[in-house]
Amino acid sequence: PIAGSMVLAAILLKLGGYGIIRMMQILPTTKTDLFLPFIVLALWGAILANLTCLQQTDLKSLIAYSSISHMGLVVAAIIIQTPWGLSGAMALMIAHGFTSSALFCLANTTYERTHTRILILTRGFHNILPMATTWWLVTNLMNIAIPPSMNFTGELLIMSALFNWCPTTIIMLGLSMLITASYSLHMFLSTQMGPTMLNNQTEPMHSREHLLIALHLAPLLMISLKPELVI
C-alpha cells in the first residue's frame, strides 16, 4: 500500500536518526576518532545505495533506495557531533521526509494509470499528464537538492561539517551527490519523456492528487524560505 510507503519514508525511517541524536548527547564529544569506521561505513553505504538506484527498473524500489542513501549522509553528520552536522542532519531529515513521501505519492499516481512500476513502461506522461510531469520535475529537483531548497541547506551543512572534520570525505560526498543527480534525472526522463507505452485512455489527475502533492511541497518551500523554523 502506498500509504505505508509514505509513512515509512517520511517518519519511520527518521526514527533511527533521532535515536542516534539522543545517544550522542550522552557520549563524549572529544572521541570522534572512535567513530571513524562508522562514518566511513555510512558514507560508503550512501554511495552503494546510490549505485543500486542506478540499476533499478522498479520505480518504487528506486525511491526506497534513494531514501537509504540520504540517511547515510544523516548518520555521518550526526556522529561527528558538531553543531553544523547536527543542524544539517535535522534539516535533511525533515526535507527528505517531505520529498520522499511526495515521490511515493507520484509513483502511486503513475501506477494507478499504468498498473505497472517498470520505468520503461511508464514513459511518455509529459504528453498525457503535463501537470503530473511538472510535479515530478519539482520533486526530483528537491531530491537533487537544488538551492534554495531545504534539501540543499541540509546537504550544504553536512558537507561543510564533514569537510571541516576530514577534508578527504569531500571525495565520497561529491561522488554520492553526483550519483544522486544522475539517478534522479534518469528517473524523471524514464517516467515522463519519450513515446507513451499506453494504448488505453488515461484519466487526468484528480484534485485530491494535486492537493496531496501540494501539501507535501508547500511546507517544504515554506521551511526552505525560513529554515529557522526547524534548525
Curated annotation (Swiss-Prot):
Assigned EC number:
7.1.1.2
Segments traversing the membrane: 1-21, 34-54, 63-85, 89-111, 128-148, 156-176, 211-231
Q: Name one Pfam family in it.
A: Proton_antipo_M
Chief subcellular location equals mitochondrion
Q: Where in the cell is it found?
A: Mitochondrion membrane
Q: Which membrane topology term applies here?
A: Multi-pass membrane protein
**Record's GO cellular component, any one?**
mitochondrial membrane
| Similarity remark | Belongs to the complex I subunit 4 family.
Q: What does this protein do?
A: Core subunit of the mitochondrial membrane respiratory chain NADH dehydrogenase (Complex I) that is believed to belong to the minimal assembly required for catalysis. Complex I functions in the transfer of electrons from NADH to the respiratory chain. The immediate electron acceptor for the enzyme is believed to be ubiquinone.
What is the name of the protein in this document?
Answer: NADH-ubiquinone oxidoreductase chain 4
**Species name:** Crotalus adamanteus
